[in-house]
Amino acid sequence: MATKHEQILTYIDSLPVGEKISVRRIAKEMKVSEGTAYRAIKEAENKGFVSTIERVGTIRIEQKKKENIEKLTYAEVVNVIDGQVLGGRAGLHKTLNKFVIGAMELDAMMRYTAAGNLLIVGNRINAHRQALEAGAAVLVTGGFNTDDSIVQLADELELPILSTSYDTFTVAAMINRAIYDQLIKKEIVLVEDILTPADRTVYLSPKDKLEKWYEKNFETGHGRFPVVDDQMKIHGILTSKDIAGHDRNASIEKVMTKNPVTVIGKTSVASAAQMMVWEGIEVLPVTDGHQKLIGMISRQDVLKALQMIQKQPQVGEKLDDIVSRGFKDEGDDKEDQTVYEYEVTPQMTNQLGTISYGVFTTILTQAANRFLRSKKRGELVIESITIFFLKPVQMESVIEVKPRILEAGRKFGKMEVEVHSQGHIVSKAMLMVQLMERS
């Protein structure tokens, strides 16, 4: 039996796109307390089912597919620009294809404006009307308003007409930044991108006998199976270690590992990797946040995803990407120690003209990561780092980074990284890392 919380989420999901939602209405229709309704609406917002807009309320929106994440809805634009909705509220859930800045004569402006666009313009009433008639939404900058006839037309066509106090350039920059941030989010590989879905996952029931494990093991060749009830709620996990020494007629419920470590679909692959190393487990059940099984991931899935992340072309550039671009592999020095060369650019410095601590830490960790991969030791997750800053590093100076493995086990390792500039040692770091060896 689904909980009240899950029933409300299912109800919200079934509502048509553009429908207005309120705590009081949900509580009344679902016969629950307002607190329960509020919590469910908040979770729906986190999942992308609904969006809350100031002075408008909460509306049901279309959940974006990951491949279309670079496109924004008008509802998101309102939040990005701190704007207000003058008319056309029913169209806030629609997606904008591109935005057009109306800094030209009206006839020329309309040549660039098409359905699904957002026209950014000042207090030009004729431009507002023609844009709406062309199927485009309108964003009025400078805090200006529009005519009542335009608001009425926007309501009829279900095309939003928005207003913001910012100027045109600032608004365009803010929307551009929002799209760019979403492109970066697109690159972050999540567990939901690599999981084996529940309908393709082999699972057992707590009521089954251990004999069932042997049957599934023979059929699939796998040795680890999630244990779920009729509602797909996860109760445990059964592995070959659990069944050792037990009779085949014993109940799975008595033998299985209860309360297994689980992740949700929105967990990053990097977090899942760290969890698997720390707990020493080979598979992780993936749930919907309420212990309902939606799939499984294995250590092999995670390693493959981490390798894919390193090879894929970057769309939105992150700070780590900018730093890693400057590395040059200088081979080995006289003592057969691997050396990486790096030039400090002006963007990497602080107000004193020396290298920023954040950038410096990134250089050290990336050098350690590159070195481990070159030694075929797999991926690393840093547990702790101690840095000794001995001398300041000036802008445009070239530094030599020398990583070295002090000790490496199957799961953990210790590393030392020395940094030299102009023949002098400028920094030394000690790293404790978790290792995830390639199988």
From Swiss-Prot:
The keyword Cell inner membrane does not apply. Disulfide bonds: none annotated. It comes from the Bacteria. Residues 195-254, 256-314 form the CBS domain. Keywords: CBS domain, Repeat. This is Uncharacterized protein YtoI.
